[in-house]
């Protein structure tokens, strides 16, 4: 997957189109990413037993995963770009910006 944890991305489709955020977590097997402040849902949490020490129940707002095809990485210039790969002089695979050709 071309998007990793810590990348800054912009949402390119869906209800949150245009929103920017940082990738909190990536799920490569499911092709999804968790983006900070994007695709927020309300989750109903049951009251937990007091001996477990968990927080009380209620409605919690949290981020839900979004498909990787609906986000685009933002390069150093602040513009969205596609991601490509190249090998550096040591033979290591490096991600590059398709728009500028620079390393990400």
From Swiss-Prot:
The keyword Glycosyltransferase does not apply. Coiled coil: none annotated. The keyword rRNA-binding applies. Keywords: Ribonucleoprotein, Ribosomal protein, RNA-binding, rRNA-binding. Gene3D superfamilies: 2.30.30.30. PROSITE patterns: RIBOSOMAL_L24. Pfam families: KOW (PF00467), ribosomal_L24 (PF17136). GO terms for biological process: translation. CDD domains: KOW_RPL26. GO terms for molecular function: rRNA binding; structural constituent of ribosome. GO terms for cellular component: ribonucleoprotein complex; ribosome. Signal peptide: none annotated. Disulfide bonds: none annotated. InterPro entries: KOW, Rib_uL2_dom2, Ribosomal_uL24, Ribosomal_uL24_CS, Ribosomal_uL24_KOW, Translation_prot_SH3-like_sf. Belongs to the universal ribosomal protein uL24 family. HAMAP family: Ribosomal_uL24_B. One of two assembly initiator proteins, it binds directly to the 5'-end of the 23S rRNA, where it nucleates assembly of the 50S subunit. One of the proteins that surrounds the polypeptide exit tunnel on the outside of the subunit. Part of the 50S ribosomal subunit. This is Large ribosomal subunit protein uL24. The gene is rplX.
């Amino acid at each position: 997957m071309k998007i990793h944890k810590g990348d800054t991305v912009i949402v390119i489709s869906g209800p949150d189109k245009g929103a920017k955020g940082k990738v909190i977590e990536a799920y490569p097997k499911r092709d999804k990413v968790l983006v900070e402040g994007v695709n927020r849902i309300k989750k109903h949490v049951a009251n937990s037993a007091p001996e477990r020490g968990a927080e009380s129940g209620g409605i919690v707002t949290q981020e839900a995963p979004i498909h990787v095809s609906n986000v685009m990485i933002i390069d150093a210039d602040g513009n969205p770009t596609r991601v490509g790969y190249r090998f550096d002089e040591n033979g290591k695979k490096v991600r590059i910006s398709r728009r500028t050709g620079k390393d990400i």
